Amino acid sequence: MGIAVEVRKVYPYPFQHVVNSYLNKYPTPLEKHVLAIKTVEEKTDPASGVVYRKRIATCNNVIPSFLQRFSILKVSNVYLEEESWLDMKTKVMTLKSRCLTWAQYATMKEESVYKESIENSNWTEFTQRGTVTITGAGFLNRVLETFAQTFLNQGVKKSISIMETILRERCGCPFS
């Protein structure tokens, strides 16, 4: 079956500020569940100038304890892989993320885009689509998908709030 979460947001800050804030957002005291982010690969295409990065995030397992009684869910840390392509010429950064921890039981993906706004070059448009499909947990599939949908909705709101806070702290008042 699966679930999907979509969000759109305009940050009233220039693309460069938003991208720098995003790439340096974690770890932060504003989000206790993201423990570390490690860049495992980074390269720049000499022809296009596009910067490719692959990062691994280490996060706390936020699955409720009553569900962690099932051995497949009882892990202390969850690992996420993020790939990004940053094109400063076109002012677009595309990201794809997936969960590595439960890959044999579920497909969890996010696709995000940050790009300079066509309405105002001092603004940055953000779009994100996340999907979760759980197939390997038997009767728990739907329960876990419902939890995932609630968690993703809350996570998106919190992530946007963290970005807004970091942008205000680093860049001051928003641009109009």
From Swiss-Prot:
Record-annotated PRELI/MSF1 domain positions: 1-175
InterPro entries, A to Z: PRELI/MSF1_dom, Slowmo/Ups
GO cellular component: mitochondrial intermembrane space
Xref: PROSITE patterns: PRELI_MSF1
GO biological process: phospholipid transport
One of the record's GO molecular function terms: phosphatidic acid transfer activity
Stored Pfam families: PRELI
PANTHER family referenced in this protein's UniProt entry, alphabetically: MSF1/PX19 RELATED
This protein's name: PRELI domain-containing protein 2
Source organism of the structure: Xenopus laevis
Gene field: prelid2
